UniProtKB/Swiss-Prot annotation:
It comes from Bos taurus (Bovine). GO terms for biological process: histidyl-tRNA aminoacylation; mitochondrial translation. It comes from the Eukaryota. Keywords: Acetylation, Aminoacyl-tRNA synthetase, ATP-binding, Cytoplasm, Ligase, Nucleotide-binding, Phosphoprotein, Protein biosynthesis. Its main location: cytoplasm. This is Histidine--tRNA ligase, cytoplasmic. It is found in: Cytoplasm.
Length: 509
């Protein structure tokens, strides 16, 4: 048995090595060599008839969430939802799966990541890729032209996930969108304000919101000499500039996508620029870009946007970044993406972006794709990358070794002597009926020490102790678990006293 266990360990390690090489896109020869080693080890292992072949695990790119993790997630959701409601949003929900043709042609090169389903009824279906396209379909179906809504739900992507960095195949998105015909840039500015409010409230670190405009990108590509047919594919290359160097992006555009080197160089002169409203004003004077109608419209709107952002007090958090491209096909105007910053390695250097935590933009043409008459409904919105935020919060709590409360129980109903189960049940029923979050131990005669230990382990702040003397006196002994202080409270006053002592918002830690 020991030899077999050792072989199983070798097979597992070799299997992980093969998977790692595939993810790193190693050479075919190297992968084949390691696969051969794996097959040789499996052959040595031979069949094990007594061992079940089924491996109990979650599918790739998914995970279970423990009560501790869910407590953190609910706290994050509460912050996000309260902000959405503060800005007047209504909530909607849509099906997890859509007709395949609803999603087709909306995501550019990312369309290959859509999960398709087989349906016995004959319909071609796909799992939703995001919450934006289903929202546009909802508007068109219901002939709505004006709504401010939020939607928090799971979406699905057939990706190669890096779960350690908060990337999955099944994950939550938290979306806020404003649909309707309004004066320019007012809804867009509010979306950026919401993004900043949420990220500041979550206290996950310094962040920067990059903004650009799809019209500026398209105008820039046009004056640089990019053929119309290559706009979107070149756009997806530029969008990688936050992850790889300009040289790598240029090599992809020239080598893989057939763009002329001199055209790529002209693009490079623009997309490596970033700044504030001064850069917008500089580009408005650019002799070539200012002659392009689309780019001029985009720059004019960005200038107005910065005026509103200054009034909202968040202009210092915003950077006009010409490399921001956002690969999705449906964006038509302003686009934005929030990244967390890590401190510079040396004095004088700029902080580095370490990952997107929110993004969004304007998509005025998406609803028209679903309307029989092509009627457009202007829309702008944002999506909070909650999975990455969850990962950051969890890592921070682990590093600080902070205890997380997994329940909101305010009080444990306990007894100091035996044969008081009926009294405990009567009291806890009174507390539940009064809206108090209460528990008791499921034993007829639990020891008082065990009841107090349970409170310390689970973070319950108060214990309501029933004893024979307390019953005679018509009082309940209320004990603070933290201070161990005990006071007698008249039974009719107990509910109000518990509410008074636990009126502070419950913390996750």
């Amino acid at each position: 048995m020991a030899d077999r266990a050792a072989l199983e360990d070798l097979v597992r390690v070799q299997g992980e090595r093969v998977r790692g090489l595939k993810q790193q896109k190693a050479s075919a020869e190297q992968i084949e060599e390691e696969v051969a080693k794996l097959l040789k080890l499996k052959a040595q292992l031979g069949p094990d008839e007594g061992k079940p072949k089924f491996v109990l695990k979650t599918p790739k790119g998914t995970r279970d969430y423990s009560p501790r993790q869910m407590a953190v997630r609910e706290k994050v959701f509460d912050v996000i939802i309260s902000c959405f409601k503060r800005h007047g949003a209504e909530v909607i929900d849509t099906p997890v799966f859509e007709l395949k043709e609803t999603l087709t042609g909306k995501y550019g090169e990312d369309s290959k990541l859509i999960y398709d389903l087989k349906d016995q009824g004959g319909e071609l279906l796909s799992l939703r890729y995001d919450l934006t396209v289903p929202f546009a379909r909802y508007l068109a179906m219901n002939k709505l032209t004006n709504i401010k809504r939020y939607h928090i739900a799971k979406v699905y992507r057939r990706d190669n996930p890096a779960m350690t960095r908060g990337r999955y195949r099944e994950f939550y998105q938290c979306d806020f969108d404003i649909a309707g015909q309004f004066d320019p840039m007012l809804p867009d500015a509010e979306c950026l304000k919401i993004m900043c409010e949420i990220l500041s409230s979550l206290q996950i670190g310094d962040f920067l919101v990059k903004v650009n405009d799809r019209r500026i990108l398209d105008g820039m590509f046009a004056i640089c000499g990019v053929p119309d047919s290559k706009f979107r594919t070149i756009c997806s290359s530029v969008d990688k500039l936050d992850k790889v160097s300009w040289e790598e992006v240029k090599n992809e555009m020239v080598g893989e996508k057939g763009l002329a080197p001199e055209v790529a160089d002209r693009i490079g002169d623009y997309v490596q620029q970033h700044g504030g409203v001064s850069l917008v004003e500089q580009l408005l004077q650019d002799p070539k870009l200012s002659q392009n109608k689309q780019a001029l419209e985009g720059l004019g709107d960005l200038k107005l946007l910065f005026e509103y952002l200054t009034l909202f007090g968040i202009a210092d958090k915003i950077s006009f970044d010409l490399s921001l491209a956002r690969g999705l096909d449906y964006y038509t105007g302003v686009i934005y993406e929030a990244v967390l910053l890590q401190p510079p390695a040396r004095a004088g250097e700029e902080p580095l972006g370490v990952g997107s935590v929110a993004a969004g933009g304007r998509y005025d043409g998406l609803v028209g794709m679903f309307d029989p008459k092509g009627r457009k409904v202007p829309c702008v919105g944002l999506s909070i990358g909650v999975e990455r935020i969850f990962s950051i919060v969890e890592q921070r709590l682990e590093a600080l070794e902070e205890k997380v409360r997994t329940t909101e129980t305010q009080v444990l109903v306990a007894s100091a002597q035996k044969k008081l189960l009926e009294e405990r049940l009567k009291l806890i029923s009174e507390l539940w009926d009064a809206g108090i979050k209460a528990e008791l131990l499921y034993k007829k005669n639990p020891k008082l020490l065990n009841q107090l230990q349970y409170c310390e382990e689970t973070g319950i702040p108060l214990v309501a102790i029933i004893g024979e003397q307390e019953l005679k006196d018509g009082v309940i002994k209320l004990r603070s678990v933290a201070s161990r202080e005990e006071v007698d409270v008249r039974r009719e006053d107990l509910v109000e006293e518990i509410k008074r002592r636990t009126s502070q918002p419950l913390c996750i830690c």
